[in-house]
Amino acid sequence: MVNKSNVLLGVTLLCIALVIVPVNDALAKYLSSDLKILEIIWARFFGHFILLVPLAYYLKGRKGFFNSSTKHQLTRGLFIFLGTAFFYVSITKIPLPNALSLLLIAPIIVVVLSVYILNERITLLKIICALIGFAGTLLVIQPGFADFNSYSVYALVSGLFYAMYLIYTRKVNFSSDSIVSLSYSTIPGAIIMTLLIPFFWESIPSLNQIMIMGCIGPVVIISHFFFIKAYQYAEASVLAPIHYFEIVSNVLISVIFFKDIPTIAVSIGIMCIISSGVLISLNQKNT
């Protein structure tokens, strides 16, 4: 059972991760204007793989790296690969915030599935907070659903795979070390994309593009480390509404780099997002 005193720590760690994640998404979208999306997906997973997997195996040894949760770890890694691939494809044709709003259907799926897969207790407050968070996201994004197309479907599909990744992250964290879990999240994607990329690579990236591609792996490692640690301290259904904080950091990046000042509706949406997370965390701590 998760110690209630650790819930706040789990929420804090997840918020840190969600501040970092949009940076990685922004790098991917920037590169997609000149490079094939498969090259960017390969860089994301191979960079993560080459930096972390050898280190994890060296530190933990064969017994620490291969254990009873290996099957779940690989399944989890496959889900994050599929979710990332569909999301990256979607942002080549639709704005990043719009894609993110569709991806964020995942926390609502987590609240429901955590009851059946993880045997976690769901409450009316958890459901309400998840819905408030989603409503806040729509206020922030104000997506034009009249322009709904196949690339929007890709973003929705990525949300489904991301939800399963969240569930399996919680499932394996009871028996696995953080660095091992972090390593397995890249193995399926790195292997699949390394096998596929020779058939799709067309041109040599510029030095600037290579440097940006090289940053994606480390950024992913840092964000996912905080992400995995968060799920060691709090239930999946408790953390679900907090994932909407990612849109807050997304808006902040837009303000800082693109001088895009939030409207009143966006500000109200941000307050809804933050409120949903605070309410569910305080309720968990006091019950």
Could you describe each region identified by the protein language model?
Residues 31, 40, 44, 90, ...:
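Hydrophobic/aromatic residues within transmembrane alpha-helices
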Residues 100-105, 172-188, 224-255:
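Helix-helix packing/entry segments at the starts of transmembrane helices
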Residues 18-26, 53, 77, 81-85, ...:
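Hydrophobic/small/kink-forming positions within alpha-helical transmembrane segments
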Residues 34-82, 161-164, 184-200:
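Transmembrane alpha-helices of multi-pass small-molecule transport proteins
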